[in-house]
């Protein structure tokens, strides 16, 4: 069979044969097979051209996706799947890109963790979850995480949390809030506890007293409509204790308030 036309169509080329067959191919395919108008090709050669054209198109799509930022093998695979590239072609493309180091899950994990230590606020547990969602194996994740020390980051995040909540919460509630926030961000309990112990917390008794009475006003408005006497006092004590206030401070405030 003979090639009757090779015409550029945006990023692809339209190849027509004298038996009316048409197919879209990449520029790489033209170069690889040295295709030109009037060239005779066999059925076997046509099959090879079609296979390579699909591979080349898939690879070009993947490289386009990778041109914006580093990505994992799973992310590239998902992108190619969305563009209807056949599974066997995707496998070939991924193998080729891994060989040329365009895709490197270990390098991705290392950069991801390093970037978080420099500008992020997440601990190892959250990072492990995020990297796992991106298709990186648990072995690679664990090995890369073991190369980093999260102490400095834990301390930095704890200090930010202290600044955010110190004047808004009583001492006990402040401790609970900082510890829980650190754990939610992926730090271990021991890391969170150590970071909290390193904080320089200045007790502002006047502010603590102000917070207590403000909360007492709020709880009194809530419970005084239904309770009085001993029941009201008990309700207020329980409510304030749940908010993290010390029982002796609560008792003292209630003596003045009621």
UniProtKB/Swiss-Prot annotation:
Its main location: cytoplasm. Gene3D superfamilies: Winged helix-like DNA-binding domain superfamily/Winged helix DNA-binding domain (1.10.10.10). GO terms for biological process: regulation of DNA repair. It is found in: Cytoplasm. Coiled coil: none annotated. One of its GO terms (cellular component) is cytoplasm. Keywords: Cytoplasm. PANTHER family: REGULATORY PROTEIN RECX FAMILY PROTEIN. Belongs to the RecX family. Modulates RecA activity. HAMAP family: RecX (MF_01114). This is Regulatory protein RecX. The lineage of its organism: Bacteria, Bacillati, Bacillota, Bacilli, Lactobacillales. The gene is recX.
